[in-house]
Structure formats: C-alpha cells, structure tokens
Amino acid sequence: METLLAILAGMILMSSLVKVGLLPMKVRLVVAVCYAAFMGWVTSHMTELSHEVFVQLATDRSIMLDLAVCVILEAVVMMTYCFCSPKQKVWGVLLEYEPVLLAIPALCYFQAQLLYGLPGVDYAWVAWMSAGLVLFLMLGGPLLLRWLLRERHLLLELLFIINLLIVVLCVAITGYS
C-alpha cells in the first residue's frame, strides 16, 4: 500500500508539473513560490505528528476511499481542461488557472517521508532544502518539458495520460485496501 501511495503522490506531482508548464511564466513563478513556501511552513506542523499517525491514515479504508474520490475528481477536472483548452472556450479559460490542489497533500506526503527517513538531521534544514528543491523543480521542470515537447497539444496529451493513469491507480488503491 505504501508503494502505491508513493506512486500516486509522484503521479500527482508530475501532473502538477505538466499543468504548471502550460501556464504563463508569471503564474508559474507564483505557483512555484507558493509551493516552496508551503514546504517550509508545513514542516513545523508535521513534526508534531508521529510516523505511526501517517501509517494509520494510510491503512484506514474510509480515509483511502475519501482520498480516492478527491483524487479522481481532480483528475477529471484536469482531463476536462485537456479537452477544453485547445478550443479556448469559457471552460478552458476558467480551468487554465485552476491550480493542482492535490499537489499540496502529495508534497506533504513526500515531506513526511523525508523527515522520518532522515533521523538526526535538523528539521529546519530539511524543510528549507526541500523548499528549494520544489522551487527549482517547479520552475525548471516545466521549462524542460516545454523544450522536450515543444508543442502545446503534446503537453496537453501528456497531462491527459498522466491523469488517466492517476484514475486507474486510485481504482487499484481502493480495491487493494
């Protein structure tokens, strides 16, 4: 189960990376700074919880079902954006600036894994190093994707495929738990 959750969180972050790559540079900068600041801020709250709390949350079936519903709804919104964006109808414009909200819990998941995986390391150092890494990846990753996939419709197809895999993974997680 832990492996499936890690893969799901990674896919959600990849989806947010592709989605941020479709935004204008100013918006990308704001999103990257917000994600990085969140990574630095959330560490003090996460250190108050023990690792067993995270394990209990991951093994509780009702929480996993609620999480699956939220993830599937977010993926459907992203897939709707993929269909509406090329036509630039009202929905495409509205969904363009809709942030990937599930990137925040995915970042929390990886921050918790990092904090509990590095015992004896200063939490503040881990927090701000991970914030710097998130800032670098959220600014550099979309530029790399735009350079590799040059055309907007290829980025939209990649976003659609990633979100389709997220939906399949959510179905697998709910069936597994």
Q: What is each model feature region?
A:
Residues 49-84:
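Alpha-helical transmembrane-segment detector that highlights a single hydrophobic TM helix
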Residues 3-22:
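N-terminal signal-anchor/start-transfer transmembrane helix
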Residues 124-129, 141-177:
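C-terminal transmembrane helix-loop-helix hairpin of multi-pass membrane proteins
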Residues 77-140:
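Membrane-proximal helix-loop-helix units in multi-pass membrane proteins
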Residues 42-47, 106-114, 165-177:
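Hydrophobic alpha-helical transmembrane segments in multi-pass integral membrane proteins
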Residues 28-51, 105:
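A generic, lipid-embedded transmembrane alpha helix
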Residues 18-31, 83-94, 145-155:
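Membrane-interface helix-boundary motifs at transmembrane edges
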Residues 46-60, 114-124, 174-177:
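Membrane-interface helix termini and inter-helical loops of multi-pass transporters
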